[in-house]
């Protein structure tokens, strides 16, 4: 038995932990057809936004997705605070129905019924932001 723990072993151990102990679905990043300039798993995210926010119009869901993809202002700490607020409290959006403006919250997580959420662990998820980035694990 080797005394060395290589990176792939570590990565696989983490994936197994999330799959077997926590019930996450596993996806291998290179197998997913997507926009490499966006770090989000947009297909699953969009489906989840519609599922968790039934009855909201497309414009509300699309604005929430836009806000998730474009909060560029501020330093990393500020961006993390904004994202954490979105996770905990939802994303405030405005939309029009019949020429009248409405506002609501689009939720990213169902805290009351966890089975309504998607839990996915991915590895080798490459995205491009100034250069190629490939975190070992993304949740």
Identify the residue ranges that each predicted region occupies.
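An alpha-helical interface "stripe"
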Residues: 1-139
């Amino acid at each position: 038995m080797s005394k060395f723990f290589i990176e792939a072993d570590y990565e696989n151990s983490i994936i197994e932990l999330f799959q077997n102990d926590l019930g996450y679905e596993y996806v291998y990043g290179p197998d997913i057809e997507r926009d490499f300039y966006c770090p989000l798993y947009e297909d699953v995210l969009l489906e989840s936004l519609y599922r968790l926010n039934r009855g909201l119009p497309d414009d509300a869901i699309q604005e929430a997705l836009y806000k998730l993809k474009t909060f560029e202002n501020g330093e990393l700490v500020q961006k993390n605070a904004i994202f954490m607020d979105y996770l905990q409290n939802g994303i405030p959006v405005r939309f029009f129905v019949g020429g009248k403006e409405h506002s609501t919250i689009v939720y990213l997580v169902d805290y009351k019924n966890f089975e309504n959420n998607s839990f996915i662990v991915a590895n080798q998820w490459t995205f491009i932001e100034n250069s190629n980035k490939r975190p070992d694990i993304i949740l």
